[in-house]
Amino acid sequence: MSKTLNDNLKEYKVSEIPHIRLMGRNVKGALKSGGPVPLFWGAACLDVRAKSGEVWALVETDYSVYEVWACVWVNGRIISRFMLEKGRNWVCLCRGFAPETVNDVRIMRDSQAMCEDPDQIFLVHSFAIEKNGAFLPLKEKKLRIEFVGDSVTSGEGLYGAVDETQWISAWISPSKTYAVKAAEAMDAEFSLVSACGWGIVAAWNNNIECVIPPIYGQVCGLCKGEPQQNLGSCKEFDFDEKPNDFVFVNLGANDYGAFFNEPWIHGGKEYKMHTNPDGSFDEADCMKVSCGIRDFLKVIRKNNPQAKICWVWDMLEMPELSTYMHKGVSMYIAESGDKNVDIRLLPPSSLEKEDEDKGSRNHPGPLTHKLAAAKIIEYCKNTLGYSK
């Protein structure tokens, strides 16, 4: 990383680049604002197609607790991943190519959106290429897919040794998730709306405020810090600007975990998903999950009137709650008459036998994400009538 730019390079603000693609939720008109572009969610990214021997990006980050990680893609493959320093710095995305080489280059946020750090931001100000280089048109993507989820969709556990237990930014890698793998295979634009520990009606620790449905309509509503809100995190998101073709929801694992954890105390009141004396799940609390699924599907459909919606789960197995997950989707379909909603169970992490296949922090590893991506791809192709 560098504070200055080499003399052989020319800087272009994001708004000055004629051909550039932004993926991941953002404020309306972010590419043409004249200012830096924030990357709010995990796997949010900027793509350029550059004729140049090297490509740089001017980025800016800040944080108080959890640093931001980024990764670089060249021609569809990740070539580097690194922790970003605080402040504004030039980052070399790639170099050493012949000047006439044309590369598809992507800089991606490889950290999830962090509600735990109200100061955390990631901005891209500019790109730089050789003075005789050029930005060329990008190939249009065929589809748009949104993935809504928790730590699995955020990529927790996809870096680090199997026995790692500390919760740090380094172990979270959205770029390696089933979601990004599936979207790339489908040649789709993608966006992730996901946060570790968050649920449908309860977070992993029974916190009823760390749930996705209430913030779904916002750009990145879980980030409520002043610098984050100044960038537009809590603004209403414009779903019509780029309508989704598919919305996959992978939530429920933290609601499941809440049954095994201590109550959350807030305002003198106790919140808890209960188990019975025999260890079974309390029926009323299970029904809270079913009703939460039904109600959230109404919100998703309202904002995505034409999309195929599919609720998926089981990468982290939750046998006691699975019936109620099914029930929630069935309740929505029965009440709405919406036939454009499906359920799919994804391969569980219990299939991982070798350390190289496993993730850190007791989360799904590379094998499970690969198998889950294959299921998503198969579902998309079947829905669209693609031949295998």
Language-model segments: what does each one mean?
Residues R144-V148, T153, F190-S194, D245-N250, ...:
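Structural recognition of the beta-strand scaffold that forms the well-ordered cores
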Residues A179-E189, F296-K308, Y332-D338:
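A structural motif corresponding to the C-terminal end of an alpha-helix
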Residues I265, D314-K388:
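Catalytic His-Asp segment of secreted/periplasmic serine-dependent ester chemistry enzymes
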Residues L136-L138, L231-P243, K298-N304, T383-K388:
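Surface-exposed acidic, glycine-flexible loop patches that form ligand/cofactor-binding
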Residues T177, K181, A284, K288, ...:
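Extracytoplasmic/secreted proteins, especially bacterial periplasmic and envelope-associated proteins
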Residues A253-D255, W264, I293-G328:
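Active-site segments of SGNH/GDSL-like serine hydrolases
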Residues W41-A43, L158, E164-D282, L316-T323, ...:
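Conserved SGNH/GDSL esterase-like catalytic core that processes O-acyl groups on lipids
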Residues M1-P174, K388:
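N-terminal secretory targeting modules
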